[in-house]
Amino acid sequence: MTTAILRRTAAQLFMVGLPGPTLEPATRRFLVDHPPGGVILFKRNVRSGAQLRRLIGEIHATGAGVSPLVAIDHEGGRVHRLPRPFTHFPPAAVLGAHRDVGLAEAVGRAMGRELRAVGSISPSRPCSTSARTPAIA
């Protein structure tokens, strides 16, 4: 295996963040030269739904045959990245307190529809591994 192939393969194991709301030439070049397995977006990357849709399209266009997974740090509650008119979902702790699987599934589906509309396939959600904290606030 050549060094170049090894580097490209290793890069696919990483999920990277971007510095801002646009794909600047240096960032685009980095994504082309070292295509990551995923890109995670944060508040600094989001201005509007239309801008986010364009940014995600540009991210996908950098992939050399394989588009990176695009996730957003959008958990509900205080961690809400999408501007109006997107729904402000409750935190996981509130959903968990209801102990209603149907409600949690409905919220997850609604969040998924909104994220899919801008081209992101996944919210970034924390997972609790402690019996004392069955849901994350």
What residue ranges belong to the model's regions?
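Flexible, charged surface loops at secondary-structure boundaries
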Residues: R7-T9, V32-P35
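Short secondary-structure boundary/capping elements
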Residues: L18-L23, L103, V107
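A generic local structural motif
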Residues: T2-T3, P25-T27, G57
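Boundary/entry segment of secreted carbohydrate-active catalytic domains
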Residues: M1-T22
